[in-house]
Amino acid sequence: MNHKSKKRIKEAKRSARPELKDSQDWCRHNYCEVFSLNPSTVLDNVERVDAAQLTTEEFIERYEKPYKPVVIINATAGWPANEKWTLERLKRKYRNQKFKCGEDNDGYSVKMKMKYYIDYMEGTRDDSPLYIFDSSYGEHPKRKKILEDYEVPKYFRDDLFQFTGEKRRPPYRWFVMGPPRSGTGIHIDPLGTSAWNSLVHGHKRWCLFPTNTPRELIKVTRDEGGNQQDEAITWFNVVYPRTQLPSWPPEFKPLEILQKPGETVFVPGGWWHVVLNFDTAIAVTQNFASCSNFPVVWHKTVRGRPKLSRKWYRILKQERPELAALADTVDLQESTGIASDSSSDSSSSSSSSSSESCSEDDSSSGAEMMSRRKKKRRLCNGMGNGDITTQDDCASKERSSSR
């Protein structure tokens, strides 16, 4: 690794994780040596279905409507990404393009050129390495070529947030890439949206918990996690062993997945989930609002993003009047029954948010969270325009990429 590469990597690490003062802090737990990344340790107890044999209607009835996680095989067949997304080809094609690999303490993106990031990936011994989790590639003149390498699987093409306009809609798609031990800390995706994650290369370990799982049961405390409180590897080291004890409540036993190349994980709205990369992993993931989850997403958007909801409603009235009519029937005073994770209101660059409470509505999001943090947060992708929880949506999927 040349001097310039080392310098750029050091700068990115210092910006993304200022609480880690030196190289010793980054490797303090020696997870590179002592943490097992053996696939045989994963129970892998989630149902798998074949995209070639499952219609969209069957998927909606069997999985989406009942909020049931599932792993889909063959949904990525024919993707150019299967051949194009190798380290060698990505380094060649996007060599000097910058990708987000974290956030600083003011909420600004920390970015690294692909050539430097791959140098970092290939040599890191960090406990929880920096992780590319980039949501802006689709708007960039060169990086948007990534969009040509995959297509949204047939089950997830209902994209109702498109009716808010591209400039206003919350971030919803991410190109993700990271080395072993990188990952995404435990969280619930924002605004009641569901998600899909298609893995092109590598292996990912998932744990998922139902929406009614008590937050205090599955969150790492500051005393337990210290500076690595919000990291996926910390969660698997601290919390996961408890889930296997006889004393763990049986109704909150995790679903476990060892996601393999070519597999797509469906995460219904409200499900807690944590993801750890077992090896070099390259994937694409998107959040979505569909006709099935629209009542919940609408409820949470009105409560958490009121200005966005008004714009959304006006366009739905014109383009999808049946959904505007459905929105009129949603009782905003009743709980949705689908939890919200207030720690997803902030990236893990704001560790103070990790002790906030989880609730079944969005009544405490927004102004309260922002005033408690008292941080200057950049509006993500030019969105916001008066919505106080704009940053909440930007950071949910990016929590451990920035910490």
Swiss-Prot record:
SUPFAM superfamilies for the chain: Clavaminate synthase-like
Cofactor: Fe(2+)
Annotated stretches, region: Disordered: 336-403
Catalytic activity from the UniProt record: L-lysyl-[protein] + 2-oxoglutarate + O2 = (5S)-5-hydroxy-L-lysyl-[protein] + succinate + CO2; N(omega),N(omega)'-dimethyl-L-arginyl-[protein] + 2 2-oxoglutarate + 2 O2 = L-arginyl-[protein] + 2 formaldehyde + 2 succinate + 2 CO2; N(omega),N(omega)'-dimethyl-L-arginyl-[protein] + 2-oxoglutarate + O2 = N(omega)-methyl-L-arginyl-[protein] + formaldehyde + succinate + CO2; a 5'-end methyltriphosphate-guanosine-ribonucleotide-snRNA + 2-oxoglutarate + O2 = a 5'-end triphospho-guanosine-ribonucleotide-snRNA + formaldehyde + succinate + CO2 + H(+)
List of residues binding 2-oxoglutarate: N197, T285
Compartments it resides in: Nucleus, Nucleoplasm; Nucleus, Nucleolus; Cytoplasm
Positions bound to substrate: T184, K204
Coiled coil, from the record: none
Keyword Metal-binding: yes
GO molecular function, one term: histone demethylase activity
UniProt-listed PROSITE patterns: JMJC
Motif placement: Nuclear localization signal 4: 167-170
InterPro entries named in the record: JmjC_dom, JMJD6_ArgDemeth/LysHydrox
Nuclear localization signal 3, short sequence motif: residues: 141-145
Database matches in Pfam families: JmjC
Motif Nuclear localization signal 5 per record, residues: 373-378
Cofactor note: Binds 1 Fe(2+) ion per subunit.
Domain JmjC: 141-305
GO terms (BP aspect): cell differentiation; mRNA processing; peptidyl-lysine hydroxylation to 5-hydroxy-L-lysine; phagocytosis; protein homooligomerization; regulation of mRNA splicing, via spliceosome; RNA splicing; sprouting angiogenesis
Family to which this protein belongs: Belongs to the JMJD6 family.
Domain notes: The nuclear localization signal motifs are necessary and sufficient to target it into the nucleus.
Protein name as catalogued: Bifunctional arginine demethylase and lysyl-hydroxylase JMJD6-B
Organism field: Xenopus laevis (African clawed frog)
Designated gene of the protein: jmjd6-b
